[in-house]
């Protein structure tokens, strides 16, 4: 689904999505520290249960003088998995080496990563569910026995050579924990899910980011941004940046109120529930052309001109979470709450 802030059918250049929790190019520049990330567990807002579990594990590892057990972090994008890995490295006082599974296509890629690991280092692999089978099999003995098994030579001259590895911690991050193979998943000592953030935590995050960006937000402005970000800090920070852009153009960086936030969100076609034009188009399609459903995914995707996988994995989760859409064996159905929201938007 095209979650974009530009008008449908417009000839203007397509803008970057503001309500997609995937990182934008400006947020994926390769710099692990953009100045907004917390550095210690005490500074990390929200995810209290996760912080408690990992805090105990960190203290125990430091007390033993050993590496932290391997950690798997899973959950929707934009909730702070990479940030938590960096925080763990800071708490442990070790180096964090960051990579992603798509960058480890060949065996030599992951071998090079493992042979250069230092004692107690933290190795972070994002999108770990996308590792290929060969890379996974190289990780098995490395994670369990701190050993790297290499095959040298070919055919009848091939022989296996084992290299001892220093103690290290692998932190894997994924949005699809079910896509990990059981042998890989079972080798993680700590498996933790990150949850969507509540309004109070999001307001604290927006307020903190505003301070770091040097902008002044009223309480109402902070509350409005936090209420439109789909429970996701990455989206909250992105919306704040777009609000800051409008404030900068109008010369109002030091007086951002709720009215200015509403103006900026309206520019990007984001409503008070955090739905954008693409979300409302899907709901309107069901309401106006299919009498609320049920409608099959393929039919709905064809009517909207979208890819079925995009609808299912990117668009629908938030609508389902908000109680605006229902999946049934016969297809997608609109809820009364969705109808009420569409009518409300028509009046507005």
From Swiss-Prot:
Binding site for ATP: 36-37, 78, 81-83, 187, 197, 234
Annotated region (Head domain (RuvB-H)), positions in chain: 272-348
Biased composition annotated in UniProt, kind: Basic and acidic residues: 28-41
Sequence segments annotated as region (Small ATPAse domain (RuvB-S)): 198-269
Compositional bias of kind Polar residues: 1-10
Pfam families listed in its UniProt record: AAA_lid_4, RuvB_C, RuvB_N
Subcellular location: Cytoplasm
Protein EC: 3.6.4.-
InterPro entries named among the record's database cross-references: AAA+_ATPase, AAA_lid_4, DNA_helicase_Holl-junc_RuvB, P-loop_NTPase, RuvB-like_N, RuvB_C, WH-like_DNA-bd_sf, WH_DNA-bd_sf
Gene Ontology MF term list: ATP binding; ATP hydrolysis activity; four-way junction DNA binding; four-way junction helicase activity
Binding locations of DNA: 327, 332
Swiss-Prot/TrEMBL keywords: ATP-binding, Cytoplasm, DNA damage, DNA recombination, DNA repair, DNA-binding, Hydrolase, Nucleotide-binding
Disordered: annotated segments: 1-41
GO terms classed as biological process: DNA recombination; DNA repair
Main subcellular location: cytoplasm
Any one cellular-component term (Gene Ontology): cytoplasm
Binding residues for Mg(2+): 82
SMART domains per UniProt: AAA
Entry text on domains: Has 3 domains, the large (RuvB-L) and small ATPase (RuvB-S) domains and the C-terminal head (RuvB-H) domain. The head domain binds DNA, while the ATPase domains jointly bind ATP, ADP or are empty depending on the state of the subunit in the translocation cycle. During a single DNA translocation step the structure of each domain remains the same, but their relative positions change.
The family this protein is said to belong to: Belongs to the RuvB family.
Descriptive protein name: Holliday junction branch migration complex subunit RuvB
Encoding gene, per UniProt annotation: ruvB
């Amino acid at each position: 689904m095209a979650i974009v802030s530009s008008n449908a059918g417009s000839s203007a250049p397509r803008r970057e999505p503001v309500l997609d929790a995937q990182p934008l190019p400006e947020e994926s520049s390769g710099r692990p520290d953009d100045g907004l990330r917390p550095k210690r567990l005490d500074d990390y807002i929200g995810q209290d249960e996760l912080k408690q579990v990992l805090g105990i594990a960190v203290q125990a590892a430091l007390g033993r003088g050993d590496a932290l057990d391997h950690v798997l972090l899973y959950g929707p994008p934009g909730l702070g998995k990479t940030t938590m890995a960096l925080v763990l490295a800071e708490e442990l006082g070790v180096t964090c080496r960051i990579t992603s599974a798509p960058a480890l296509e060949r065996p030599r890629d992951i071998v090079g990563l493992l042979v250069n690991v230092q004692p107690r280092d933290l190795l972070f692999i994002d999108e770990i569910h996308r590792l290929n089978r060969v890379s996974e099999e190289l990780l098995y003995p490395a994670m369990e026995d701190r050993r790297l098994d290499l095959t040298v030579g070919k055919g009848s001259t091939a022989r296996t050579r084992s290299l001892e590895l220093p103690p290290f911690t692998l932190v894997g991050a994924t949005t699809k924990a079910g896509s990990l193979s059981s042998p890989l998943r079972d080798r993680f000592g700590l498996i933790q899910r990150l949850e969507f953030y509540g309004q109070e935590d999001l307001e604290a995050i927006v307020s903190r980011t505003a301070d770091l960006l040097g902008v002044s937000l009223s309480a109402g402005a902070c509350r409005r941004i936090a209420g439109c970000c789909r429970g996701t800090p990455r989206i909250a920070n992105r919306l704040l940046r777009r609000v800051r852009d409008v404030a900068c153009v109008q010369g109002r960086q030091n007086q951002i109120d709720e009215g200015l936030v509403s103006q900026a969100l309206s520019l990007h076609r984001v409503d008070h529930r955090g739905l954008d034009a693409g979300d409302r188009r899907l709901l309107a399609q069901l309401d106006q052309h299919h009498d609320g459903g049920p409608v099959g995914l393929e039919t709905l995707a064809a009517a909207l001109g979208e890819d079925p996988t995009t609808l299912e994995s990117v668009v629908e989760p938030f609508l389902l979470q908000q109680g605006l859409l229902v999946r049934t064996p016969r297809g997608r159905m609109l809820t009364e709450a969705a109808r009420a929201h569409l009518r409300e938007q028509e009046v507005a």
